[in-house]
Regions:
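RNA pseudouridine synthases
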Residues: 1-239
């Protein structure tokens, strides 16, 4: 099992992706010789949207992959996200519940019309606002947990609520014209920053954390943010 961090910039043509790099690393480990068996096994337990950064979980064998996938399905694999929202939500903490359906390569909220679509699925998330700034337009830093794993869920639900994620050109173009006057940011301001799981072999509880690298997070007081996350305190306002 490996918990790995993805750089906020997606791999482009000719650039190695994280899966290829991990397989290359595993192939070079002592005793990794696999005569006649091809490349090392690497199971992807869960994925992130291409423009999103953060922690990923991989399994080095099928048994571990099955155990970790079971944790994910049962909600025992706990993930937290940081998201930068365009605007200030009225409630500093709350839940968003919507019905989503996939149309091609995008997800669409059909809340209130879900009975019209057989493929509409419920999507639920919980958020807590950690900090609010003006840079130069109103931006809010949210800590997000999801109760379901729908396609583009966090991005679509916040956009549907009127607070699209900074940098999300797919779901928040109108808000981005104000929030990104000179294309100051690139990539979606969303990071899977915290991950907790039970090791599939040892049974040990494990936790991992990363600090976002996307410059969209640079305007927030990250040291203060760490304290807020650890101590469960209130909202910090700056600017």
């Amino acid at each position: 099992m490996s918990a790995n961090r993805r750089d906020w910039q997606s791999a482009g043509i000719g650039q190695p992706d994280v899966v290829s790099e991990l397989k290359s690393y595993l192939a070079k480990l002592p005793g990794a010789g696999r005569p006649g068996k091809g490349e090392p096994y690497l199971g992807i337990v869960h994925r992130l949207d291409q423009p999103v950064e953060g922690l990923l979980v991989f399994a080095k064998d099928k048994k571990a992959a099955a155990a970790l996938s079971k944790q994910l399905a049962e909600g025992a694999l706990n993930k937290h996200y940081y998201a930068v929202l365009c605007g200030y939500p009225d409630c500093p903490e709350g839940d968003l519940v919507d019905y989503l359906r996939k149309e091609g390569n995008v997800a669409v909220a059909v809340t209130g019309r879900e009975q019209e679509f057989a493929d509409a699925k419920i999507a639920a998330l919980h958020y807590r606002i950690l900090e609010e700034i003006n840079d130069p337009s109103p931006l809010a830093l949210a800590d997000v947990t999801i109760g379901t794993g729908r396609f583009h869920q966090i991005r679509v639900q916040f956009a549907h609520a009127g607070f699209p994620l900074l940098g999300d050109t797919k779901y928040g173009m109108a808000a981005l014209k104000e929030a990104m006057p000179a294309q100051k940011y690139r990539g979606v301001a969303l990071c899977a920053y915290s991950l907790e799981l039970v090791h599939p072999i040892s049974g040990k509880k494990m936790g991992f954390r990363v600090v976002p690298k996307n410059p969209a997070f640079a305007g927030f007081a990250m040291e203060e943010l760490k304290k807020l996350t650890e101590n469960e305190t209130g909202i910090s306002k700056r600017g």
